[in-house]
Amino acid sequence: ADENFKKLAAMFPNAVTETINENGEVVRAIDKDVLMQEISCKVVDGNEERYQFTWPDKKKSVLLANAPINRTLRPVREDETVPTGADSEGKPYCSTGSVDFDTTENLYIEGDNLEVLKLLQETYLGKIKMIYIDPPYNTGNDFVYNDEFGIRSEEWNDTSGNYDADGNQIVGALEKNTEANGRFHTDWLNMIYPRLRLAKDLLSDDGVIFISIDENEIENVIKLGCEVFGEANHLGEIIVKSNPRGSMSTAEIASLHEYLVIFSKNRLDCKIVGHLLTEDMSSEYKFSDAEGNYRLLGLRMRGGFWRRSDRPKLYYPIYINPKTGLISLEKSDEYCEEALPIQPSTMEDGTWRWSRDKVKAEGHLLLGKSVTRNGETCWDVYQKDYLIKGDKERRTKAKSIWDEPEINYQNGTVEIKSLFSKGGIFDYSKPVFLLMRIFEMLDLKDEDVILDFFSGSATTAHAVIKYNCETSKRCKFIMVQLPEKCAEKSEAYK
């Protein structure tokens, strides 16, 4: 709230005034009437109809995001153990010491992620390049953070049990959100909304957030994202084929996929560079010269406004040296073969993709070739499209459907099993491949910081380490996870 006040005060200093608060103290405030005059546009007020996305307790959720806290982050060094909670009998369980605490550049933070996000504002405001979160999906069988009644660490020793009056299991600050709960979507929205607001402030201007979600809350995630980050910064959704066999959780349709919802902090600064080419794609670059491998792209416009009548200035002759294939805009004894952008099937006059000026400046990238069309020999012009331009390898735009076999979420379970030599440690872990695909889309650089505040099995941390090893980069991660007591019969506890 203080930051928002400072921003308004900087933009509209004449709207800053003083008033008396509930304690009788003189405090600075914003004069609403002056602010409305400065904005000088239509303002929706009171009960006037407007388009909005709202739910019960939304105002409290906004206040929760802005409310200050009196907590701090405590380091856990190599030779320390720190109590992080207690079971129903009051028996404490602890976090073990760090590894190379004074030299590591990565952080694993145990605590309520809402509080941690507020604490991170002090050091990481505007410094996080990428955020990935895999929040509770609100399936009716998972848990959401109960921020209003959540049990904080200092209260855990006083708790009398793991179930509330309605029989819902309580684990730390987590509460089961069943469909029988009349506040089913409301509770989930009140959990995620303040966290997204705080997450936005942590992102750098070119930062991006990726949110994994399924059909239960996909619509609400998009609406929330548009409100928090702005509709113009909604980069889209990727359908992730996570379960090729199909989920049996619904009676009518077996779902094969989940979603990856993407928002940028500022779309103009954000760069989604796409993915490196597959071997099949690279094989298209079958020609080579001193500059490297390339493919040939026809210079004639194939789609859109391709007719001469649409763009008459892009219809002009190009002359070709039949011995070398080199081109010129001027006809001569050397450049004697003429090429025109003629549509082959209809023989209509078309257009080139390049203007005369561009051909003059970059003609070294063009090549004339003899071709046969409609039984006759003629000449056409092609562009050399190189696999590597400068020091950048060619990439392909990220697609809206990811269905690679490696993205099957069963692989996440296999990866966890390979790390611990047994299964059952974590349920529904994301595969490292999913995060690696995301990192590749952004072409992460040295010192970029990746945040995951629903860390779970820490797949994101695993992926950052793997990415650094494979690319020789030095990206860093911050993982945040609420400490949870494992059931004594579970594989994770054993």
PLM regions: where:
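DnaQ-like (DEDDh/DEDDy) 3′-5′ exonuclease domain used for proofreading
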Residues: 1-132, 137-194
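Phosphate/ATP-binding catalytic cores across multiple sugar-kinase/actin-like superfamilies
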Residues: 113-116, 120-123, 191-196, 201-205, ...
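SAM-dependent methyltransferase catalytic-core segment centered on the flexible catalytic loop
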Residues: 127-208, 216, 232, 257, ...
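Active-site-adjacent "gating/activation" loops or surface patches in catalytic cores
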Residues: 153-168, 391-430
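Signature of N6-adenine DNA methyltransferases within the class I
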Residues: 192, 205-206, 215-282
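Active-site-adjacent helix-turn-beta-strand microarchitecture at beta-sheet edges
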Residues: 266-417
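Conserved class I S-adenosyl-L-methionine
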Residues: 447-456
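Glycine-rich SAM-binding Motif I of class I
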Residues: 458-462
